Amino acid sequence: LLRTSTLASDSLDLLSLLYSDKNYSQPLSVGFKGNPHMGSLVLNSMIGGPAYNAFKSTFSNGDRIFIISSICGGTGAAGFPLLLQNFRQSDNNHIRDSYIGALSVMPYFRLSDPGQTSDIDSNDFMTKTKSALTYYTRQDFTNLYDSMYYIADPDKQTHPYTNDEIKQENKAHIIELLGAYSIFHFAINNSHRGTVNEYCIGSNDDKINFDTIGNSTKQALGHDLTSLHLLSKLHNTIKENKNNLSFCKVNNFNSSFFSDPFFTDAENGLELFLNDYYQSWIKELDENDRGFNPFDLKLKGKFNTLINGNGHYVE
């Protein structure tokens, strides 16, 4: 990206102020590890590339843009402002004039104290967050987006730090679930330029359920998530007992029906999703220090006490 051999000496002097020797040699395959000055350089080189041009050529009137980024590190903190400014300066009028929303995820976990070889120190998360917010709240920047969503939970959950993207195992977290919900909120709302949204749970409890997650989120998630959870609990039982269940006989829910690739496909089958992905996801949400436990995961058989809390959700 930086062809230093062709630069004048005064340009090299300037670069030495911005980038250390470690920056020059740091691999970027997993992001910029808390170095937004590196991220902005790399991401800017992608503007005008094949992927960006494909997006630009297919974007049409009425389409919307939603940018998801973290704010305490390098990749997201650098990429969000860069993308936003490029969209608003695009020569595609549909992109330039579109509704643009963004989710900025602030710290919601800490890492164990870093060692000498660690590239990331979570003690710097809040400092970097405050630095980014100073820029994000400037009027010339707020005029670029229509709706901004902020979410954080800085005082919960410490993860052991591993300087390896494969071995660094972070559990699914309620912040990620609520952050994803902001996409749906943005899709159905026409906010005026510079609108800011912040999330507040109904009660500051270590374990959150449908009673304490907040009324609008409860209404949005309660019915559908409960239906999905019931399906995950009942599907295998129904399949195993299909020959003895009258509704299976009446509706031809037989061996041929349950052998359909819709259920059994090794990559996209429903059973793979329910047994391997959904069950581990809902379990990880429950295990965090700030846990989301809408259901009694230990319950077997009768489901009249399946839903934690008072058991009511809005249909």
Tell what function each PLM region has:
Residues 69-79:
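Gly/Ser/Thr-rich loops at beta-strand to alpha-helix junctions
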